[in-house]
């Protein structure tokens, strides 16, 4: 799928994430389109921070945020997802785009 088609299908206007080479086309598109813009695109220090930023965006606007990351960062989102996205707590909706590292049969670095 082309990045432009993905962006159109998501119908979102706020993205936050940790850049990943597997998601380079998406990262390049976001930088070209928004740069670093607190209203549309924030690069955070780790994936858990991204979830917190995205949750704040949703609370302020009511819109669905998008978080992008590589799968090695999933452990960093456990606490914010369990506390902020849980339907019995804040029930914040969020879209995740997660790159897949460590695919069987493919040589790949665990992180970069």
Model-derived regions, located:
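Thiamine diphosphate
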Residues: 1-112
